[in-house]
Design a protein with these regions (language model features):
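RNA/tRNA-interacting regions in translation and RNA-turnover enzymes
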Residues: 2-189
Length: 189
């Protein structure tokens, strides 16, 4: 989130930093970027380091009147390298490094706005821009119980396997005889 009145223009731009570009983060530290670091910008200036930390120049303060909420997904490898390059590891960078499900971005922003209203911290005035051009499809893996038992050294029935897989949010598709992983499970292919 950022203070709308500290931003210039209505644009949100994602761009690569210039080599040796300086930026002051929310913690008051000046950071030196290279051209691999992604920056979140308004119409005129950088206001945050993508997936890592916002800028001091657009921070929320006690006198904030209007906030802009942003939900995004960035490439985990880029965030990890950028975080290391600038010497700043944050909760945000840790989450992005592991990979986030872009399908959850809209639900996350909706929940943040809902909480703002429920807590009496503000009023949501609406309006959303979605620039996500793709969604992630669930991964599908051929279900081969015999092969699984051989690999694990077990003698589980097909039904037992389906039950166990269901406990970790993996669904069985009878029509295709496949295990379907939810989109947030990027580790299953």
């Amino acid at each position: 989130a950022s203070d709308v009145y500290k931003r210039q223009g209505k644009e949100i731009v994602v761009r690569r930093a210039e080599n040796d570009e300086k930026f002051v983060t929310l913690d008051g530290q000046e950071r030196t970027m290279d051209d691999q670091v992604l920056m979140i910008c308004d119409g005129e200036k950088a206001v945050g380091i993508a997936g890592i930390m916002g800028g001091e120049n657009s921070m929320i303060t006690d006198d904030v009147q209007t906030m802009l909420f942003e939900a995004a997904c960035f490439d985990g490898t880029n965030i990890r390298k950028s975080s290391k390059k600038i010497g700043l590891r944050t909760d945000a960078s840790g989450k992005f490094e592991k990979g986030l499900d872009p399908n959850n971005a809209e639900a996350a922003i909706d929940r943040a706005c809902q909480l703002m209203e429920e807590l009496g911290a503000g009023e949501v005035v609406g309006g959303m821009v979605d620039v996500c051009s793709e969604t992630r499809e669930p991964s599908r893996v051929k279900f081969e119980p015999e092969k699984i038992n051989k690999l694990l050294g077990t003698s589980l029935t097909k039904e037992e396997m389906i039950d166990y897989l269901g406990r970790v949010e993996l669904a069985y598709d009878e029509k295709t005889d496949e295990i379907v992983a939810p989109t947030f499970r990027q580790d299953i292919h």
